[in-house]
Amino acid sequence: MSTLDFRFTKSEKNLNSTLIIIPMVLLFIGIYGGFMQTLFRAGIVQSDPFMGGEYYKGLTIHGVLNAIVFTTFFAVALGNAVIPWSLKMNLNSKVAWLSGILMLVGSVITALVMVAGEATVLYTFYPPLKAHPLFYIGLVLVVVGSWVAFFNWIPMYLRWRKENAGEKTPIAVVGMFTTFIVWFIATLSVAVEILVFLLPWSLGLVDEVNVMLARTLFWFFGHPLVYFWLLPAYVMYYAFLPKIAGGRLYSDMAARLVFMLFIVFSVPVGTHHQYMDPAIGSQWKFLHGVFTFAVAFPSLITAFTIAASLEYAGRKRGGTGLFGWIKKLPFFEKDSWFFSYLIAGLVIFIFGGISGIVNASYQMNTVVHNTAWIPGHFHLTVAGPVLLAFLGGSMYLIHQFMGKPVKMKGWTLSVPYIYTIGVFIFSWGMMRGGLIGMPRRTNTGASYANPESMLYQPDWMPFIDISVIGGSIMFLAIVIYIVAFFATVSARSEATLEAVTFPVTAPLHDEPANWLRNFKPYIYIAIVLIVLSYTPVILDVLESTTGGSLPYSPNSPVPLR
Amino acid sequence: MEKEDKDLEGFSPKGAVAFFLIMITVYVVMWFSLYFELIGRG
Amino acid sequence: MDKSEKLALNVSGLLLVVFLVAIVYASVAKEVDVPTCITDMEPFATDTLFQTGPDSYELQMVARMWAFQPGNITLPAGSTVDLYLTSQDIIHGFKITGKNLNLMAVPGAINYMSVTFEEPGVYDFACHEFCGAAHHTMAGKFTIVEEEAFEGETFGEGSL
């Protein structure tokens, strides 16, 4: 595959660098908050110099900046990178910058409102806790900005299809479009929640909001959101990892099947976050559970396909025996530093996957719902494979778009391994604590973990302390990364500036897979499943709830008006 | 590292199959340990 | 698709089917289920506890910032409690440690689950959904006493 005839413009390079560097600063603020939360929870600190003593404000900042802002920026930057490169077509620069500016302005507004303490509502912003209207407006701008980026790619894709009739769409493009198709469908729901209900209510234009309805609209968005996080990582696993490892993607058809299944099953699953909610019939909760199992299927296939691709690479490198090929993979080769970010994430995801299946398993959710098990679980998914792939990807994109040599390669390569040790310890503590009843989203340091409190729970202490150890190691790894990242950003440009390139190679098995070449039928099936699965849920909510709720501040049990 | 364009002859992912079956076994054990916790709580 | 891929596909499908069958079994045979839609109950704003049979009670619980009402319930061993839960302000969460009872308390809706306490002991519950500045102090407990030592069900304010 020759890419010599395609070059990114200066404007595209600058935009993509901006979309990586600014969110990296926000990510670090959020991660600092996360580290402080482990200390708060254990009662080690009651206040910190930057964020003060408000645990829940810090938790809101941690969730919003890390899970929504950083992830959305990276997904857009990756799309802005691999779609033009794969299709050999430049972006419409004006539209791309418009998208970037909308997202940047939105993020800054949201961040400032949170830091000012005007939006201590956590990243789920459930009413009737009310945030400042600018919090919702900032989030809307981030989402609209990401839509603009997506709309910028659609005509490129359609033109490419026309000019290359009969050719397979490159897998990275399929993956990025899958990501944003899922994102677009999901964000329609949260747009309705915010624009129709929360924003007018926050502004005082309407008095009351139906809390169950808002909550249901949130989770229509909230679960596909996790695939929006995961899918760009899958793009890197399928498109980049085989080549970085020194092999080939085992099966092109499996990759295409996986992406199409994500389009079909990502959305009609949200009610599995509401298993313990009132006002939704248990039969519909079960239906969403079945669909959630269906969306687990493509991830299981991914585990096999990636393992087979790595085995191919390991054997090419001279590995023998049933597992000898593993030892030959480039875990510690400085020039293949990107490998460590992808492989460590995959190992973490083995456990993120099964804990997620547990959460989705209908009445088994009773054991874990809203306990510390849940943050234990999702630090093995979004803060595991997703974070590591995005950090590796960010470093790679900066290296390519700014033409900078990757600095501190040895340290850069070690970050994922240090982080993996940390996150396993952290999540083990959280999950075990959750099983004996420790709640999530709770400043235990001020009550349950305080020996002087009447509520003291000595049984929880070992697990809280374990999460401090794990959290500290995770934070250390990220500090190393941030130093290496900014050392790279501020390094002198490479003498010979080569064209931007991505580690992509042809698959080993390349079947025609004609039935997997068009998004349309899968989007239609997805719409049918969404209508079937959500109509009864929404009807139940509307029929069995009474009255609306006035807005509340987190600081007072008396409504704000 | 061998040259990239030279494919392995008759490659079959035996190790990946073995890995996958081990992973599924681990999944079954982990899932059912939670399942019996649930049943036991009553 | 080659043989190994088909194997992976089939094993994945089988795994999920086995899990689903186990879930249905727990629901049908063991009657461990999730809360469902309650439509035959009038909204309530105050808490009550009353006996409905030899070993059964109905408890209507109200969650508010930052207490459960009642926060302290004493019952004899062997009691089955039909627990109705609502919120009078914002969203709260309610989970009894060591029992299969985990409910969201949402304003404008009534949640329901039944629970049986066979063994005497103290069963704590703590609010598990962020509900404002003092969320981490919102807790309570069931005290289950031996049937012989039982002197009438009580319920009251306070978390301890």
Show the residue positions of the predicted features.
Chain C
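Extracytoplasmic entry segments of secretory-pathway proteins
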Residues: 1-67, 150-160
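Beta-strand cores of secreted/periplasmic/IMS beta-sandwich domains, seen most often
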Residues: 43-90, 94, 111-119
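A generic structural micro-feature
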Residues: 75-77, 105-107, 134
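Extracytoplasmic/periplasmic beta-strand context in beta-sandwich domains
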Residues: 92, 138-141
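Extracytoplasmic beta-sandwich strand-turn segments characteristic of Greek-key/jelly-roll folds
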Residues: 95-120, 149-160
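Short, exposed beta-strand-loop hairpins at the edges of beta-sheets
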Residues: 128-136
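Interdomain boundary/hinge segments at the C-termini of tandem beta-sandwich modules
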Residues: 142-146
